């Protein structure tokens, strides 16, 4: 006792040791041996070598992933990859893309880091930093690619993107320590390195340039339906002519949710983190996961190769290692949609997958109703949609109306709803731009039914706008007026103009007026289509509370859109089983209708026959025995 024992302090690990340890941990915990073998094989075949250092160049990564030149997104994507490859030492970004750095970047981009890093944080902040530049003069900002390991080494340990000194930027908030980076150091038992100077750079002053963000959204729309073993080149038909123009237009609608490209040069962190979880929570998930999983499938290994015989082994022939088979270049992918719609196409489908899980959309939709084909009537809508027992997706597109009604029918619609109080929602130009095409929709998980005193739907319902501004209105818990289908009634205590409504209260006999001029009650955040499917109105009363749908995160203001309906369609979400059930119900109803037509009362007395049918509830009381058109 009393004798001092000198304990030699262990020196802190170097950056290289930390990166090697983290990459090894990711490889062991996040991948199968087969996937790591394929990743190493792909890296070996793709890497360039400078002074015994193997690394991947920008054009090599783009060529392997088949990134289209038409999108001009390769520099943006490689900036993100090389930044994430520097994890957890983000101050050293951009990193040379060696094997260990590639493992780290792919682990983050595919979301597999969750198997190792136990942190409540997500990768949102990392993704923003990987796409942002720190130059206030964004018009002059350029991305500086890493040409080689020697060039990166010459730039010093603090090499990366140009960073200005902190100034009086609007983005003055201190984002604090990055939880994901801290979790990485904790998993390696070297938290002191994080606390003593290796913390990631601050977000203050960072922006994603608007042009870069548009190109990135175009890529994400393209890769959204991609399967890990599908070739991106299989979707090349979406990159020519009008298809490319439509892809760009769809991307512009999504970008409008984050920023007005005519007003601001780039996207800030505060705006990014505010909008992304509400309007585009799945934007980076499915597409990036599948795209960067391509590195985990090697083309040099054939899973279908037979095991060599003993004579082959005697001749020294090496067997091929088993691997998941990569798809043949001649294999045609299953179409994303079984048929084209008037509104829904591949780009709109990808846009929907940004906030509705893609598993419910891609190769799972069936066109139930189309106004162009089935007629714009509630009777036709009911006969086509009500038998679908799975979730449905309603889309409506129309032309924005002027403030002053034009014609008797438009005037009648304006007289059926409360007077306009709010300006237009804006989007594709000035807020007063009439004749602009606008698109709304709703996702309803419950089957459709008639609405008498209670609406249908649940808290998974979503109301949304797709153009000219992408916006999402999540279900609220304040009330349950999620969806309604009300046929018009011209008299009585339950008088209602009728129509399809989302976020509007159900008809209430105690409050309804018997006068034919009663107004439709519009919810604070609501979409209403009149009974003729000729006009519609979307209302966003930001000052009110208690609606069935939450207000806009992107546009916290009052606005209203009145429009003339051009297209209306409903898609059923589900597979062959749901289609089979619907077909069976249609067949049963057809048999019942045929049986009703063949009823032979045999009395010869028309008045007595009619009285008997009225007692059965088949005619009379505003019933005609068929659908009301």
From Swiss-Prot:
Listed Low complexity bias regions: 326-336
Pfam families: TLD
BP-aspect Gene Ontology terms: response to oxidative stress
Swiss-Prot/TrEMBL keywords: Cytoplasm
Region described as Disordered: 307-336, 406-431
Chain ranges of the TLDc domain: 342-574
Basic and acidic residues biased stretches: 307-318
UniProt-annotated location(s): Cytoplasm
GO cellular component terms, A-Z: cytoplasm; nucleus
Cited function: May be involved in a process influencing telomere capping.
Protein family (similarity comment): Belongs to the RTC5 family.
Entries under PANTHER family matching the protein: NUCLEOLAR PROTEIN 7/ESTROGEN RECEPTOR COACTIVATOR-RELATED, RESTRICTION OF TELOMERE CAPPING PROTEIN 5
Protein name: Restriction of telomere capping protein 5
Native organism: Pyricularia oryzae (strain 70-15 / ATCC MYA-4617 / FGSC 8958) (Rice blast fungus)
Biological classification of the source: Eukaryota, Fungi, Dikarya, Ascomycota, Pezizomycotina
Gene it is expressed from: RTC5
């Amino acid at each position: 006792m009393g004798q001092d024992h000198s304990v030699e302090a262990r020196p802190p690990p170097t950056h290289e040791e930390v990166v090697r340890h983290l990459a090894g941990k990711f490889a062991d915990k996040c991948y199968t041996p087969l996937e790591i073998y394929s990743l190493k094989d792909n890296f070996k075949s793709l890497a360039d070598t400078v002074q015994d250092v193997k690394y991947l160049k920008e054009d090599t990564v783009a060529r392997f992933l088949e990134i289209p030149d038409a999108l001009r997104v390769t520099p943006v994507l490689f900036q993100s990859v090389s930044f994430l490859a520097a994890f957890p030492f983000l101050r050293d970004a951009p990193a040379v893309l060696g094997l260990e750095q590639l493992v780290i970047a792919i682990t983050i981009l595919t979301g597999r880091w969750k198997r190792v890093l136990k942190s409540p944080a997500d990768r949102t902040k990392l993704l923003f930093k990987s796409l942002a530049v720190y130059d206030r003069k964004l018009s002059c900002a350029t991305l500086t690619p890493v040409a080689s390991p020697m060039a990166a080494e010459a730039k010093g340990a603090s090499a990366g993107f140009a960073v200005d000194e902190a100034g009086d930027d609007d983005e003055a908030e201190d984002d604090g320590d990055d939880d994901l980076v801290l979790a990485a150091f904790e998993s390696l038992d070297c938290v002191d390195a994080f606390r003593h100077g290796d913390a990631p750079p601050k977000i203050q002053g960072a922006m994603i340039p608007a042009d870069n963000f548009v190109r990135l959204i175009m890529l994400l729309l393209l890769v959204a339906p991609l399967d890990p073993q599908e070739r991106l080149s299989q979707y090349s038909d979406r990159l020519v002519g009008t298809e490319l123009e439509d892809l760009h237009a769809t991307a512009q609608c999504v970008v409008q949710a984050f920023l007005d490209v005519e007003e601001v040069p780039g996207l800030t962190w505060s705006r990014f983190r505010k909008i992304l979880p509400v309007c585009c929570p799945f934007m980076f998930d499915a597409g990036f996961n599948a795209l960067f999983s391509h590195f985990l499938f090697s083309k040099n290994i054939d899973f279908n190769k037979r095991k060599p015989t003993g004579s082959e082994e005697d001749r020294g022939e090496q067997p091929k290692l088993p691997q998941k088979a990569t798809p043949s270049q001649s294999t045609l992918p299953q179409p994303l949609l079984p048929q084209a719609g008037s509104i829904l196409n591949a780009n709109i489908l990808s846009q929907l997958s940004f906030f509705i899980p893609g598993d419910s959309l891609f190769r799972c939709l069936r066109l139930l109703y189309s106004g162009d084909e089935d007629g714009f009537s509630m009777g036709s809508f009911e006969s086509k949609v009500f038998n679908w027992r799975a979730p449905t997706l309603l889309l409506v597109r129309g032309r924005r109306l002027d403030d002053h009604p034009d014609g008797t029918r438009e005037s009648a619609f304006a007289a059926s709803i409360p007077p306009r109080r709010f300006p237009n929602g804006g989007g594709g130009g000035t807020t007063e731009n009439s004749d602009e095409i606008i698109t709304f929709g709703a996702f309803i998980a419950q089957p459709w039914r008639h609405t008498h005193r209670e609406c249908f739907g649940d808290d998974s319902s979503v109301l949304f706008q797709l153009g000219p501004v992408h916006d999402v209105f999540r279900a609220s818990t304040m009330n349950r007026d999620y969806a309604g289908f009300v046929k018009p009634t011209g008299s009585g205590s339950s008088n209602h103009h009728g129509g399809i409504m989302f976020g509007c209260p159900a008809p209430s006999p105690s409050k309804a007026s018997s006068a034919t001029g009663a107004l439709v009650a519009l919810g604070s955040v609501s979409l209403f289509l009149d009974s003729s499917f000729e006009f519609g109105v979307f209302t966003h009363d930001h000052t009110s509370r208690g609606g069935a749908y939450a207000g806009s995160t992107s546009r916290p203001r009052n606005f209203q859109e009145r429009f003339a309906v051009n297209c209306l369609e409903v898609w059923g979400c589900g597979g062959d089983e749901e289609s089979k059930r619907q077909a069976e119900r249609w067949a049963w109803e057809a048999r019942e209708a045929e049986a009703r037509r063949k009823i032979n009362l045999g009395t010869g007395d028309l008045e007595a026959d009619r009285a008997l049918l009225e007692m059965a509830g088949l005619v009379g009381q505003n019933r005609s025995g068929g659908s009301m058109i």
